Design a protein with these regions (language model features):
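Inter-domain helical "communication" segments and dimerization helices
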Residues: 1-23, 41-44, 68, 112-121
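N-terminal positioning helix adjacent to the helix-turn-helix/winged-helix DNA-binding module
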Residues: 3-11, 27, 50, 59-65
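Basic, amphipathic alpha-helical hairpins
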Residues: 12-26, 46, 50, 67-78, ...
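Append "Primarily bacterial transcriptional regulators
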Residues: 27-37, 42, 46, 82-89, ...
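HTH DNA-binding helix-turn interface
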Residues: 43-57, 99-109, 113
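Terminal helix-turn-helix DNA-binding modules in bacterial transcription factors
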Residues: 49-53, 57-86, 113-121
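Sequence-specific DNA-binding recognition helix
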Residues: 73-111
Length: 121
């Protein structure tokens, strides 16, 4: 059986490297089932080893991913709703709130900055 540090490393790999955060239905419970541990243990691992809550960590990963998509030429015609869904958010308003929390700007503002940079080139 894994100790908390080992489980934290495994969890980070599962979430970040495998991009399971992009699944809208991904939750603490689904992660717990995948690992064969209780949801309460998942929460304690996040608090003790990662230093944040499960949901804050997952939503930050979703926010980072959304920002990458917003800056990508491939996704420049995608709607903000599409970007939100592709990043694992259930709707664009949740992405909007998290983007403000993490970056201090909204996804719409981010998109305008990217478009202005493209025009200058």
């Amino acid at each position: 059986m894994y100790n908390h540090k080992e489980l934290a490393a495994r969890i980070k790999t599962m979430i970040c490297d495998n991009h399971i955060f992009r699944d809208i239905h991904f939750s603490r419970e689904t992660l717990a089932n995948e690992l064969g541990i209780s949801p309460a243990r998942v929460s304690s691992i996040f608090q003790e080893e990662i230093g944040t809550s499960f949901y804050d960590f997952v939503n930050r990963q979703r926010t980072y991913h959304a920002r990458r998509l917003l800056k990508s030429a491939v996704h420049k015609n995608d709607t903000l709703e599409d970007i939100a869904l592709q990043s694992g958010f259930s709707n664009r308003m949740t992405m909007h709130r998290m983007s403000l929390k993490v970056y201090g700007i909204t996804p719409g503002e981010e998109r305008k900055i990217v478009k202005n940079k493209e025009k200058k080139q």
